């Protein structure tokens, strides 16, 4: 594009230049040219290029029409040449100026052309953008038209539905007005009936609340009594613990004194062994060839006596060590026997746990508690016997240890035999700790078991609170219970009532199972008492809940099928009086007044 404009401009400039030369240089005749050749003016005509000024043309024309003289021709030639040269210079200058102007115009035109091209490109880009925007607007317009059509159709459908819904609403309002009238009549009839029923329920709940308050006061009183007994038992335990600690301190002091004596005897034995080795070394040395002096017989006898004395002391020490080793072996065997007995007792406890789990029934809970109470008493006696035996055995080795160092001259020698007595004392201390742990574990288990068995009838879902009313031997049987079952439940109620006669014994057993820092298992916490007062969940307890399933359970877990339960059942048959009043927990005492009518 720029090249074409440039070429067109150059062509236009060439045309203008040709026109200018044509205007300034008219045509010269051929005769004049020949005359110039003859006159020797070929060079000037060549330089002029056929371009002559008007003066030259007039002179040539005058020379052609009227011949002149040679002198005049020579004078005219240099004037014409200088004029031509000046004219040519002027034309060259003007041409240079025109050339510069033309070049300047070309540059300006180039710049304008470049700007024009840039503007055209920007316009093309804008046109493309506008076309793209136009396409987008067209698509948006198409979508908006479609959406408008869709919304118009939906509005029509909604208008139709609105009409139908208004019609339906009118129908429903008419039906509702008819239904409300009937409902009001029914509500008036029902309110009159429900008011009387609610009043009756309110009176019944007030009665139950009064009963619960009375029971709560009784439970609080029993809780205070049990807490006092627990504090007394805790003080008793503290005194026993202090006595045991004093005995252990005495034992430790005696052990320290024995250790000191043992060290002293060991040092004496070492000194005797050194002296004996020196004497043997002196006796084994060969006599010098020339002894300076022969020892006397008195000195030799003295040395022999000293040697015999040292040998006797060593022999006594060896015998003493053997006796101590035998004693340690005997004590170890006794400790093994005691450990085996403890293991047997633990196995018995496990068997009793399994037996109690198998015999866990709500109707026979009090009998099982009696059996457990017997086993607890037996275990307490066994524990007391073990404690007495341990005390005797702990006192016996100390006395023997105090007597033996006085009787024997030498002390126990080095080795494993001398440390057997200390090991024996440590094993006995561990055994006493083990016995205490077993006592605490069994007490805790028995406490949890009593809590579980007494609260089991409360939480069992099969029974109702109205079916159970033991007290004074009278009982109202439920719909699925016969007269014999009612009498059995009444006997159980009598057993609960008779538990008050053995209040001290049962309370002492319950408090013996609780450490000083733990609350009694049967005494409910303040939160539990508050919950019972608010909700009335524990207002009544059924002791005759579904007797037939319970009998089925007794068949499945009968003591005849399980040999571990036979001794307890046999003991209960031999002592029938204990089944009604020996092991009633203290939290059952508040129940009989509530159940009596």
Curated annotation (Swiss-Prot):
Residues 1-80, 96-120, 390-422, 457-498, 549-576 are annotated as: Disordered. The keyword Membrane does not apply. One of its GO terms (biological process) is Golgi organization. Residues 38-50 have a biased composition (Polar residues). One of its GO terms (cellular component) is Golgi cis cisterna. Residues 81-141, 199-255, 296-394 form a coiled coil. Residues 53-70 have a biased composition (Low complexity). Residues 470-483 have a biased composition (Gly residues). Keywords: Coiled coil. It comes from the Eukaryota. Residues 100-120, 553-563 have a biased composition (Basic and acidic residues). Belongs to the GOLGA8 family. This is Golgin subfamily A member 8C. It comes from Homo sapiens (Human). The lineage of its organism: Eukaryota, Metazoa, Chordata, Craniata, Vertebrata. The gene is GOLGA8CP.
């Amino acid at each position: 594009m720029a090249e074409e404009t440039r070429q067109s401009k150059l062509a236009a400039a060439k045309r203008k230049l040709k026109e200018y030369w044509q205007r300034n240089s008219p045509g010269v005749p051929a005769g004049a040219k020949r005359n110039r050749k003859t006159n020797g003016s070929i060079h000037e005509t060549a330089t002029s290029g056929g371009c002559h000024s008007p003066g030259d043309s007039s002179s040539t024309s005058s020379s052609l029409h009227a011949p002149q003289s040679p002198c005049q021709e020579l004078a005219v030639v240099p004037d014409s040449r200088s004029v031509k040269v000046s004219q040519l210079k002027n034309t060259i200058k003007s041409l240079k100026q025109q050339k510069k102007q033309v070049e300047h115009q070309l540059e300006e035109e180039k710049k304008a052309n470049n700007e024009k091209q840039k503007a055209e490109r920007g316009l093309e880009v804008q046109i493309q953008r506008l076309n793209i925007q136009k396409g987008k607007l067209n698509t948006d317009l198409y979508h908006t038209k479609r959406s408008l059509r869709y919304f118009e159709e939906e509005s029509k459908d909604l208008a139709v539905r609105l009409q139908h819904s208004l019609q339906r609403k009118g129908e429903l309002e008419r039906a509702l007005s008819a239904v409300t009238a009937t409902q009001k009549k029914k509500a008036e009839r029902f309110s009159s009936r429900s008011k009387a029923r609610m009043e009756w329920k309110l009176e019944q709940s007030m009665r139950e609340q009064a009963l619960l308050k009375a029971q709560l006061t009784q439970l609080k009183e029993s809780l205070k009594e049990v807490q006092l007994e627990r504090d007394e038992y805790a003080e008793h335990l503290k005194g026993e613990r202090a006595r045991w600690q004093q005995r252990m301190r005495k034992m430790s002091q005696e052990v320290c004194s024995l250790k000191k004596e043992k060290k002293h005897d060991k040092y004496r034995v070492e000194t005797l062994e050194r002296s004996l080795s020196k004497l043997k070394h002196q006796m084994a040395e060969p006599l010098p060839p020339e002894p300076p002096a022969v020892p006397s017989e008195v000195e030799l006898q003295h040395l022999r006596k000293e040697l015999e004395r040292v040998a006797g002391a060593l022999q006594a020490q060896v015998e003493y060590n053997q006796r101590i080793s035998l004693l340690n072996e005997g004590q170890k065997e006794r400790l093994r026997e005691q450990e085996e007995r403890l293991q047997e007792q633990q196995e018995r406890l496990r068997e009793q746990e399994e037996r109690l789990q198998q015999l866990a029934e709500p109707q026979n809970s009090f009998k099982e508690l009696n059996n457990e109470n017997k086993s607890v008493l037996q275990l307490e006696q066994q524990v007391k016997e073990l404690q007495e035996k341990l005390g005797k055995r702990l006192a016996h080795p100390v006395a023997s240890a105090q007597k033996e160092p006085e009787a024997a001259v030498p002390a126990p020698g080095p080795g494993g035999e001398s440390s057997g007595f200390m090991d024996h004392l440590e094993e006995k201390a561990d055994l006493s700790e083990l016995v205490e742990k077993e006592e605490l574990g069994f007490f805790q288990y028995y406490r949890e078991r009593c809590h579980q068995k007494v609260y089991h009838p409360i939480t069992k879902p099969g029974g109702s609170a109205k079916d159970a009313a033991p007290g004074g031997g009278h009982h109202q049987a439920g719909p699925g219970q016969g007269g014999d079952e009612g009498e059995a439940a009444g006997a159980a109620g009598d057993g609960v009532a008779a538990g008050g006669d053995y209040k001290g014994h049962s309370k002492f057993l319950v408090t013996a199972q609780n450490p000083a820092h733990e609350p009694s298992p049967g005494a409910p916490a303040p939160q539990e008492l508050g919950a019972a007062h608010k909700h009335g969940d524990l207002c009544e307890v059924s002791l005759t809940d579904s007797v037939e399933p319970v009998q089925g359970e007794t068949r499945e877990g009968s003591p005849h099928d399980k040999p571990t339960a036979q001794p307890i059942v046999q003991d209960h048959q031999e002592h029938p009086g204990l089944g009604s009043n020996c092991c009633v927990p203290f939290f059952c005492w508040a129940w009989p007044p509530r159940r009596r009518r």
